[in-house]
Structure formats: C-alpha cells, structure tokens
Amino acid sequence: MTGVRVTYVDAEPNGLAAMVGGLIEANLERHPDRRGLLRPAVVDLVAIDADVATSLQLDRSEVRVANGIANGRAHLRLTADSIALVELAATPLRLGFPDVFHPEGRAVTRKVLGREIRIEGLLRHPLTMSRLSRLLSVV
C-alpha cells in the first residue's frame, strides 16, 4: 500500500463510512501521489436522504473513518442527498473544485450554489475542501 492506513473506528461501519473509506483506500492505492493531500483535518459527510453520517479524521499517515458526526470538531461539513455526494466524487475537478467547463462540474456547482449540497466551513477552509475533493475524486 502507500503507507497510509485507512482505519474504521466502529466495528460495523455504516454504508456511507464503508463507501467513503473504501474510496479513499482505493484512490491512495491507485494514485500514491495523493498521499500528499493528507493534512490534519476533520470532515463530516451527511447523507440526509439515508439519515446516515460519517466523519473523517485526516492525518498525514492515517485516515480514521467513524460513524456519525464529529460533534462540532469538524473543519468542514458536507450535507446532501447520497446521490449528490457520489456526484461530488465523480465530477471533473479544476484546482480541487468542480470544473465549470464540464457539464458535470456545472451541475455540481449549481447544487452547491442552490444549497442542495451544503458545505459548512468552505470559506474558512477552502484548501481543506480542495484537498478532500481531490482525495475522493474518481476522475
């Protein structure tokens, strides 16, 4: 592997935690250079339609994935329906943000501006959001 461990805090990760943890693990395996994106941060992901949440604690050598939210400790909190969260990972990026020159990027940008995808902490932590997007990106 890449020297970065993806660990699950809970014995039985919820579906969102398993999906996101697996995605990060696969991306780090396929693209070892993405290890450089890891900086200390806490990120909550909330799928409102499935009533499920996960928190990621990022570190240079480990990504800890937990069920639920980080109780106010998160630098970023992304809240959307589960389809929009998946679309976020599948959107072409430019500088770590959805590329508005691609139709998929414009669609995700519209959802962010229309608050279908809510990103709390984006203005305070834009680089964290950019690194997270590139870490999760499957494109």
Enumerate the language-model features and the residues they cover:
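Feature captures hydrophobic
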Residues: M1-V139
